[in-house]
Amino acid sequence: MVEKIIVSNPVANLLGDEQTRVIWDLIEKKLIFPFLDLKVETYDLGIEYRDKTNDQVTIDAANAIKRLKVGIKCATITPDEARVTEFGLKEMWKSPNGTIRNTLGGTLFREPIVCKNVPRLVTCWNKSIVIGRHAFGDQYRATDFVVKGAGKLELTYTPADGSAPQKFQVFDFPSDGGVALGMYNTDASIKEFAYACFNFSLDKKWPLYLSTKNTILKRYDGRFKDIFQEIYEREYKVKFDTAGIWYEHRLIDDMVAYAMKSEGGFVWACKNYDGDVQSDAVAQGYGSLGLMTSVLLSADSLVAEASHGTVTRHFREHQKGRETSTNSIASIFAWTRGLEYRAKLDNNDKLLKFCHALEASCIDAVESGFMTKDLAICVKGSVENVKRTDYLNTEEYINKVAELLVSKLTAL
């Protein structure tokens, strides 16, 4: 057996729900703890325990991430009315991801995991496109309402220093009314977004593009453009030049067109709503939503998780004692991306190499023909073309990754 790697500082381990919790347990037992001497602070974010603690456990988990600097999160249920009934919940608890984002702030980076033999819907995407989504403000913190009849819509800003208010005329509504929206962002949050994107690009050694619609929202989107440009010129241009990469602002429509015909290999900084939409479009373009990592990077902490949900349909089969073939790759990458950040904070080169070896083992397994059913369907073109011998079940795939990992670690 390979000697365990000592990890000197702990991480927060956030448990989740349903089938992803099942594979989380397998990942811990077969891919993490046999190889690492690692201390974890565990927080049960399963829906039933969140309900039992009135969601206090989510707040505790977010604060632990702040303190420990690293959180590794399993997918969780965000309850709707049907889930409230199913679990007999006290109330419709908020998304744990939203609570964590509101506590930590930061930027959400979503990156596809590229396997050469998994066909891409956008065939020219040979390298990853990372979406950096500004996870604060805009439509997600907006005030919107229905206007019932004729009237004047105004915006008023009242300075805290007691100086004269500024009033802006927005629209005169006709008698049949309409809808209205007021939204905002802050310089501090935009600056944090910019720093996160520049640092992420430098780390990847990939160019960075910011997309806005500053031709229409001259002041609102213009503020994003100006802040990014100021920080780039002052602090990053020389570093980017040295690394052989660049930063550019592009209009969102131009950027979408460029992305569709590019080969990938860049970081795309998006405002909150744009990032929400484009990250799913990019994920599907690479062929599988099950091959997408997600990290929330704030000024001094990181939370990593899979970009998919709790895989309820597979969990129902698991509950009946039936065989499942659930893709665990994104959940494994949640562990590797979290531990990679821990390794960089601690200057732990052995841990960093372990993370890279585990990621390579996942990809090598798929590229050697060892994969779960969802990927076999992608490779074969349709479910009708897939035989049982074409794929592994949930545990068999993780066992295969463990086998490849041992050989890679032995060779280090």
Swiss-Prot record:
Q: Which family does it belong to?
A: Belongs to the isocitrate and isopropylmalate dehydrogenases family.
The answer to keyword Metal-binding applying to this record is yes
Q: State the SMART domains in the record.
A: Iso_dh
Q: What is its main location?
A: cytoplasm
**Which cofactors is this protein said to need?**
Mg(2+); Mn(2+)
- What is the protein name for this chain? Isocitrate dehydrogenase [NADP] cytoplasmic
Q: What keyword terms does UniProt attach to this protein?
A: Cytoplasm, Glyoxylate bypass, Magnesium, Manganese, Metal-binding, NADP, Oxidoreductase, Tricarboxylic acid cycle
Q: Name one GO biological process term.
A: 2-oxoglutarate metabolic process
The Enzyme Commission number assigned here is 1.1.1.42
Q: According to the record, how does the cofactor bind?
A: Binds 1 Mg(2+) or Mn(2+) ion per subunit.
InterPro entries assigned: IsoCit/isopropylmalate_DH_CS, Isocitrate_DH_NADP, IsoPropMal-DH-like_dom
Q: Per the UniProt entry, what species is this protein from, by scientific name?
A: Dictyostelium discoideum (Social amoeba)
Q: What class of enzyme is it?
A: oxidoreductase
SUPFAM superfamilies, alphabetically? Isocitrate/Isopropylmalate dehydrogenase-like (SSF53659)
Q: What residues bind Mn(2+), as annotated?
A: D253, D276
Q: What Gene Ontology terms describe where this protein resides (cellular component)?
A: cytosol; mitochondrion; phagocytic vesicle
Note the Pfam families from the entry. Answer: Iso_dh
Does the keyword section mention Magnesium?
Answer: yes
Gene Ontology terms for molecular function:
isocitrate dehydrogenase (NADP+) activity; magnesium ion binding; NAD binding
